[in-house]
């Protein structure tokens, strides 16, 4: 079939090297670590020890112990719904669903099939001859005949097989529970649990990698290849990504931390062709919680993160970063009556205005000056371009000029008019007084004089964590377009100037508003080109209708997002066919997604999330964090208010407030 291949282990992989343990060393120490410590083996009355660990062995070595029927896979009810099947291998109960430390040893002995069948023919004849003396001989003959008929009619290969489960613990009491757990899991397969105490040393010896030749033949049973393969385990536990970059998630079954790279390693392997991400999760599914968890770890690994939000989801994290960096980072832009949002588009820290900075200033002035349905003439564009260039030249020459919109306005009013007069520029080509009149609300004393005249010398290029909170202005026809241009300019500036540094722009629900305000082309440009600048664009949405109704989402965002992240979709289970078709999900991926949060461990507090990479790799992980992280990310208003009050009480020390709040909750 090509789905399974065998790879011969090298000598170093078997016996190890000076720095890395081989598979034999790992087996003898019951460890998967590359620096395994060899343990003493000791045999006692009815028991065997490896180091401090006592072994417990269950075997499937007798046909009477086997299930009445086997299959390649079975439906796992706990993670299945009436609209989806979660399929696991038949032997999954002793594999990934058995949560203690254990090894499953499976043997297939490919003997001479024809010789085996001849022996069975002879045995059947003997049984027939002796059937008059014992009914059991007659019954055995019938079983052998049935085996032979199956082999000849279907052309099956006769083989011998064996399966055993070797578990261990350094605590005898715990080992008793483990023994019961293994027995219960075997019973789930409808097999008869057989706890083997006599043959433990022999079977342990035979299971040494490469030593199956010493396997005791009497411990095997005859079957066919097809049936024996049904005892193979098709699942594995979660493995850490072999990459220095990534985020920390959790194994959904065991709670074990997993290092997961969803950006660099998949790009290197060719699993994905871009780092963009599309995140879908209804309200309350833990969507913002997961994105907080993700961007914090990206930020801590050197990424420049720019977030556009409409719900204060990242306020706690931003405030924490702001406090930790003593105000150097964690910049939070939001609009409030007593503290309105303010920028200074004319300020750059290094004093260098490159072409893109000049173009962004011109675009900003044009947005203030002209309506969407009122394009500027060529003469107006030239006049404005000259005005911007001359003003920036004045700033470069004269350090006493403070760059701001106010000084730009005064330059147009007091100096640029004379220049236009000298050039004999006609009023109909550029109406300077009309221009000043339209821009007056943004000048000193005007209604929006705060907007472009910030006195904070803030260069966003070198700020690594920036949040634009647009909830209060997303419907404001004056403020919203200006802020979106600032956002656009900020990220493009980072994209082009920060060579070799990872950049991420994350658009929460704000993408809907942005896509309406002439920013649709920017989104298209962003998603198609950001990968060339070691960047990634992330869109987060919660409504299925948003995906279905938006041409930008369907045509640009989804098609250019090789990493898709979905949270609990049970709310949309009746609409999931549309989601599946739109995202191009396979039936297996559908089953994985609909299994999210179906069988959560009540003793742990976590939400599950599905991650799909390039349509070829996918898995469900858990977002499980400490109480400290929880209170940093929470979007529950009562919890946020509790944290804010404690922060104020502690003089603005949010980190200490988080620690105290988490500690108080643990003690309850």
Predicted regions and their residues:
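P-loop NTPase motor domains
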Residues: 94-99, 191-192, 203-258, 264, ...
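A short, charged
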Residues: 279-303, 645-668
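Conserved P-loop NTPase
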Residues: 586-647
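Glycine-rich, often proline-containing surface loops adjacent to acidic residues and nearby aromatics
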Residues: 154-167, 278, 463-467, 504
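Gly/lys/ser-thr-rich phosphate-binding loops in alpha/beta enzymes
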Residues: 70-96, 298-326
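A generic structural motif
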Residues: 2-10, 106-108, 189-202, 329-339, ...
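Extended, folded cores of ATP/NTP-driven motor/assembly subunits in large transport
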Residues: 1-235
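Conserved P-loop NTPase motor cores
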Residues: 263-285, 289-297, 305-315, 331-339, ...
């Amino acid at each position: 079939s090509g789905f399974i291949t065998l790879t011969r282990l090298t000598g170093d992989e078997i016996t190890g090297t000076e720095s890395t343990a081989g598979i034999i060393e790992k087996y003898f120490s019951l460890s998967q670590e590359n620096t395994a410590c060899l343990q003493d083996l000791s045999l006692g009355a009815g028991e065997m020890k490896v180091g401090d660990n006592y072994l417990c062995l269950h075997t499937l070595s007798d046909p009477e112990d086997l299930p009445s029927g086997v299959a390649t896979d079975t439906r796992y009810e706990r993670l299945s719904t009436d609209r989806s099947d979660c399929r696991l291998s038949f032997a999954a109960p002793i594999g990934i669903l058995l949560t203690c430390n254990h090894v499953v040893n499976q043997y297939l002995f490919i003997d001479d099939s024809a010789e085996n069948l001849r022996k069975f023919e002879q045995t059947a004849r003997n049984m027939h001859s002796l059937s008059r003396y014992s009914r059991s001989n007659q019954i055995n003959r019938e079983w052998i005949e049935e085996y032979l008929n199956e082999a000849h009619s279907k052309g099956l290969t006769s083989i011998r097989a064996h399966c055993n489960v070797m578990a261990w613990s350094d605590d005898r009491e715990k080992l008793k529970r483990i023994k019961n757990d293994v027995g219960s899991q075997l019973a789930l397969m409808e097999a008869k649990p057989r706890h083997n105490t006599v043959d433990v040393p022999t079977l342990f010896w035979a299971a040494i990698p490469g030593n199956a030749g010493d396997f005791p033949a009497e411990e095997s049973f005859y079957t066919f290849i097809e049936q024996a393969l049904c005892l193979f385990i098709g699942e594995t536990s979660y493995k850490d990504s072999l990459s220095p970059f990534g985020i920390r998630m959790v194994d959904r079954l065991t709670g074990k931390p997993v290092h997961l790279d969803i950006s660099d390693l998949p790009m290197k392997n060719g699993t994905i062709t871009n780092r963009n991400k599309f995140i879908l999760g209804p309200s309350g599914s833990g969507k913002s919680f997961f994105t907080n968890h993700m961007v914090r770890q990206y930020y801590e690994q050197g990424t420049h993160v720019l977030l556009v939000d409409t719900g204060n989801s990242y306020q706690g994290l931003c405030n924490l970063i702001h406090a930790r960096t003593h105000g150097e980072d964690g910049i939070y832009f939001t609009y409030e009556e007593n503290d309105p949002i303010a920028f200074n588009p004319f300020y750059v820290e290094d004093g260098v205005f490159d072409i893109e900075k000049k173009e962004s200033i011109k675009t900003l002035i044009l947005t203030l000056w002209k309506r969407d349905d009122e394009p500027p003439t060529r003469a107006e564009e030239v006049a404005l371009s000259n005005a911007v260039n001359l003003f920036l030249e004045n700033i470069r020459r004269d350090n006493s000029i403070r760059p701001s919109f106010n000084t730009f306005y005064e330059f147009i009013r007091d100096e640029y008019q004379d220049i236009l007069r000298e050039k004999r520029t006609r009023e109909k080509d550029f109406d300077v007084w009309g221009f000043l009149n339209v821009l007056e609300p943004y000048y000193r004393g005007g209604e929006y004089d705060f907007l472009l005249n910030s006195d904070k010398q803030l260069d966003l290029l070198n700020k690594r964590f920036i949040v634009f909170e647009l909830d209060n202005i997303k419907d404001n026809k004056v403020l919203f377009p200006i802020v979106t241009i600032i956002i656009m300019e900020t990220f493009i500036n980072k994209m082009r100037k920060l060579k070799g540094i990872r950049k991420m722009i994350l658009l929460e629900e704000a993408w809907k508003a942005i896509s309406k305000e002439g920013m649709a082309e920017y989104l298209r440009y962003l998603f198609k080109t950001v990968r060339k600048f070691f960047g990634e664009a992330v869109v987060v949405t919660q409504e299925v209708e948003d995906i279905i109704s938006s041409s930008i989402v369907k045509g640009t965002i989804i098609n250019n997002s090789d990493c898709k992240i979905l949270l609990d979709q049970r709310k949309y289970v009746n609409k999931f066919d549309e989601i599946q078709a739109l995202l191009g999900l396979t039936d297996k991926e559908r089953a994985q997604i609909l299994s999210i949060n179906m069988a959560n461990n009540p003793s742990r507090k976590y939400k599950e999330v599905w991650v799909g990479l390039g349509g070829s790799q996918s898995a469900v992980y858990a977002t499980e964090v400490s109480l400290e992280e929880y209170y940093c990310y929470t979007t529950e208003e009562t919890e946020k208010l509790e944290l804010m009050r404690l922060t104020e009480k502690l003089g603005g020390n949010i980190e200490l407030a988080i620690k105290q709040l988490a500690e108080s909750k643990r003690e309850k």
